Structure formats: structure tokens, C-alpha cells
């Protein structure tokens, strides 16, 4: 495991009288971090679906090729969730999750400059693999900060990030198309969502 991904040591000791308040504040911060982080993962995953009409019109890809691209990403993502979650156990969840999101954004920028089918296929596979770096750290963070009796409620709240992230992709891409125009469909579909996801 790379040193940068390892969990760091605590930088300072908290005075006993402030432990309870500090703990409460930190665990809310931890929950919001994984909520917003996983929300951002969806921005650079579901944006691909919105680009499919342009893949057909502008790059002359067939429905079969587009379906294959979607399948490649989802299969890679499914495999990656198991592998990456195991690796996340040995890493700092915060750093691991952030690295995965940045890598997904980089792949999306690559999609914004690609036109060949096999390059697209390779990039969507990489996107699927890096997408798997989001779920493990989220579960680990929730388990580390919340007792078993609270995890159902906390997990339900975190799960909303899937819907919020998936729901805001269309407005983001739509606004990008309105500003940039359909001639810049790759930037609107891939590069703008990548930038928004990293800002999150």
C-alpha cells in the first residue's frame, strides 16, 4: 500500500472536557464527507448515460457498441467494489475515497477528448474500476464513527447520496449544454461534470 494512502496518526490530544463535543462534531463532519463524496462519484458515473445520443450521432457508434460500453463500466464497477473495499481496509478512508474521485474525474476528462471506440471502452473500464473506490471508505467511515445501534439510520441518510448525485447530473449537464452549445457536447457531458465532482 502506498504511504500516501495509509492512515495518519492523530496530530494532537483533545482535552478530556472537550472530548464529547469534539467527537460529536467530527463524526458529523465524517458523515457529511462521505455523503458529499459519494454524491460526487455519481456525477462522474451517470453522466455517461446522458452522452449516449451524441455517441451515436457524432461518433457513429451503434446501439450495440454503446450498450457494450455501458456494460463494460458496470461490470468493472461491480468487480472493483469488492477489490477496492478490501484495499480500503488498509488505507485512510478519506484519502482513498478522494483519490478514487480524482481518478474518475481524470478519466472523464479523457473521455472529453476521445473519439475512437476502443479508447472509449478502455476509459469507461477504468472509470468503473475507480468508481469502486467510493463505497468501501464510506462504509468504513460510518462503522468507525457510529455505534451499531445508529448505523441503520446513518446508513439510510448516506444512501440518499446515491439519489441526489444521480439526480443532479442532468441539470449539471443540461446547464453545460446551454452555455457551451451542442457542438461542445464532450466538454458538457464529461469535462464539466468532472470539474463539478472534484469541487464537491
Predicted features along the sequence, with ranges:
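Small-residue-rich segments within alpha-helical transmembrane domains of MFS-like 12-TM solute carriers
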Residues: 42, 46, 112, 128-136, ...
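Extracytoplasmic
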Residues: 29-63
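Residue-level signature of mid-helix packing/kink "hotspots" within the transmembrane helices
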Residues: 46, 74-82, 167
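Helix-loop-helix hairpin linking two adjacent transmembrane segments in secondary transporters
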Residues: 158-200
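Conserved MFS/SLC helix-loop-helix module at the cytosolic interface between two early adjacent transmembrane helices
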Residues: 79-117
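Cytoplasmic helix-loop-helix junction between adjacent transmembrane helices
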Residues: 123-160
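Short hydrophobic/alpha-helical segments at membrane-entry points of transmembrane helices
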Residues: 116-124
Amino acid at each position: 500500500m502506498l504511504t500516501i494512502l495509509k492512515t495518519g496518526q492523530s496530530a494532537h490530544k483533545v482535552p478530556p472536557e472537550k472530548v464529547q463535543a469534539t467527537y460529536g462534531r467530527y463524526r458529523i463532519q465524517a458523515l457529511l464527507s462521505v455523503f458529499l463524496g459519494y454524491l460526487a462519484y455519481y456525477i462522474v458515473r451517470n453522466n455517461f448515460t446522458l452522452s449516449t445520443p451524441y455517441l451515436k450521432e457524432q461518433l457513429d457508434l451503434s446501439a450495440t457498441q454503446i450498450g457494450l460500453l455501458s456494460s463494460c463500466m458496470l461490470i468493472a464497477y461491480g468487480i472493483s467494489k469488492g477489490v477496492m473495499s478490501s484495499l480500503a481496509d488498509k488505507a485512510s478512508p478519506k484519502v482513498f475515497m478522494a483519490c478514487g474521485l480524482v481518478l474518475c474525474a481524470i478519466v472523464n476528462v479523457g473521455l472529453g477528448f476521445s473519439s475512437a471506440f476502443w479508447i472509449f471502452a478502455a476509459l469507461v473500464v477504468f472509470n468503473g474500476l475507480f468508481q469502486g473506490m467510493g463505497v468501501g471508505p464510506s462504509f468504513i467511515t460510518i462503522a468507525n464513527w457510529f455505534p451499531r445501534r445508529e448505523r441503520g439510520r446513518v446508513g439510510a441518510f448516506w444512501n440518499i447520496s446515491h439519489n441526489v448525485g444521480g439526480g443532479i447530473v442532468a441539470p449539471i449537464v443540461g446547464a453545460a449544454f446551454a452555455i457551451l452549445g451542442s457542438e461542445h457536447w464532450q466538454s458538457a457531458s464529461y469535462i464539466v461534470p468532472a470539474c463539478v465532482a472534484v469541487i464537491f
